Amino acid sequence: MKKKLYIAYGSNLNLNQMKYRCPTAKLVGKGTIENYELQFKGMPNCSYATIAPCIGKSVPVALWELQPRDEKLLDRYEGYPSHYFKQDLPVKLNNGSELTAMVYIMNLKQDFGLPSASYYDTVLQGYKDCGFDMKVLNEAVNDSAEKYYENLEQNNLFDSPDEDMGMGGMSL
């Protein structure tokens, strides 16, 4: 059986979740993916973590060793290949070494949005489990929310305040 190295950056940082999802997976290291940023995409109030290229940014990650069965289970949980695709990326480990491992990345056609409270809490616990700086997670949520609302404004999906007040566009 060939083992595979897997990069986690979202809810699969959560140790209890990974223990449940992939009972034979082993946490083997922590590090960063350089020149990528964490984002939340999907539905407006039910978005999930993904990563995207962004020069100068980095994403903290956990490195898991997966058995073939673990990978099949993760494929199902991650909605591979319809929701996420797989890619091999370099990881800079905290000990200074670098290696390449598999990561799930959301299909690019998804819009920015906000994570549900329960999903955010799961990712937050993962950040705590791994000892990561919460700043990256909170910036990702804020940036994704900002882009979501910008998209609404650009597409004129907000009603004007006058219409909301039932004044037929008249100002008082």
Residue ranges and their predicted role:
Residues 1-172:
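Glycine-aromatic micro-motifs
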